[in-house]
Amino acid sequence: MLRAGTKLIQESHWTLVKNILKYLRRTKDVFLVYGGEEELVVNGYTDASFQTDTDDSQSQSGYVFTINGGAVSWKSSKQETMSDSTAEAEYIAASESAKEGVWMRRFLIELGVFPNASSPLNLHCDSNGAIAQAKEPRNHQKNKHVLRKFHLIREFISRGDIKMCKIHTDLNVADPLTKALPQPKHETHMRAMGIKYLRD
């Protein structure tokens, strides 16, 4: 939002800058903490917000991958294509997330630290529609217009690289990367990513 408005600065942009500075001041005592489990626990979370950009009606994607409760990879970005529905936006976000997950899984296997090389990486999603599209493509003929590159997630699932898992919206750690949240909910998600305050 802030980056998109650098050409024409308005009062709302100054408000955004002030909010960012307040956030930085408020979070100066924040650290990223990883759990001390003996075995690595890797989880991925994906989310999307449907047509959140009021200027061009594009959706926002976000993902977070954690190892032992601490974030190791995350991304928030505007989707490059228009979505017709929330499920489609979530499916596109899941596909982009799956690519990162497959790369991470292979990297950890090459290092010899992935807990079980034959197990898929769990990718948590709060959209039943997106999960169904990824797992059962033959039942979704109305989504033929979705760009072919987003269907790569189906191959990842069939190869056993990724396993799509349903998660409740309130527990989806990627939620803050797609939209603004009330502060208590935002802080709950931050803690789930391994972000802790010095006072904790």
Can you say where each PLM-predicted feature lies in the sequence?
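Contiguous, well-ordered alpha-helical segments that form the cores/surfaces of helical PPI scaffolds
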Residues: M1-A4, A48-F50, Y63, G129
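Structured nucleic-acid-interacting core domains from mobile-element enzymes and related host factors
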Residues: K22-T46, N116-A117
